[in-house]
Amino acid sequence: YDALPNSLPRVGGIITSVVQTPLSHVNLRAIQDNVPNAYIANPLSNDAIASLLNGYIYYKVESDQYEIREATLAEVNDWYEDLRPTETQYPIRNLSITEIIPLDDITFDMSSSFGAKCSNLATMRSFGFPEGTIPNGFGIPFYFYDEFMQYNNFYEEAQVIMDNPAFQNDINFRNERLEDFRRSIKDAPMPQWMLDELQAMHDAFPSETPVRVRSSTNNEDLPGFSGAGLYTSKTQYPDEGHISKSVKQVYASMWNFRAYEERDFYRIDHFGAAMGLLCHPNFQGEQSNGVGISID
């Protein structure tokens, strides 16, 4: 690539041949993952870099210079083990809220049930911005994802998938098997009560409104772990039928290859991970978009 995709999986270092923006998804991922990242003009024309292709490298980036050389396998293994937590991490997952709630009724401390993205945006609606600055909408709690997964026995299926030695040791097999699993999630049925509640939420939006269904998990937008680009958001257009289509597409993204690899590296319990949803009118005619990072 000249410009790396936002869906970049875990890597040991990044070089781009085009200038990056400080708040690009790629740069945010590099900061979060503590990996070196630099723009280097015409890197493959540089023999000192090109000669290292397909081998282990030592790569260090400072504000005005970089160092790159061949590395030993021991150096590589030591580097990654130093980055990983030593114990399994269990993200907070509160399933006590069992209903879809308007954003104006969701508070900051309800992130344990809706995810930080949803609760943060809901809280911003109380900041006094001009009407329309922060979109109105609804939050769908983790409870819905958990009930959907249990209804289809997907937790058990995921465990069987993960226990397969080929899945654990073959990255291509793992990628393909996760793709199959996501397809199963998208095609799976929902209990009728869930379909009814999703339809009631959808009907509450003005007629013909495209609704943006955004991921809001308990393992992104957290202190020290942004999760930028790991999960997928979808827009439900008026001619697409029941909004469960988009909901299931976002639920399936919990098992994106890049998301699975990131959780696995950080030893985050896959079955404690939960998907909340932030639903609001889709932004129309936007001139640009990006990521905002506060000083705290």
Summary of predicted features, one role per range:
Residues L28-N34, S126-G128, I295:
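Alpha-helix C-terminal capping segments
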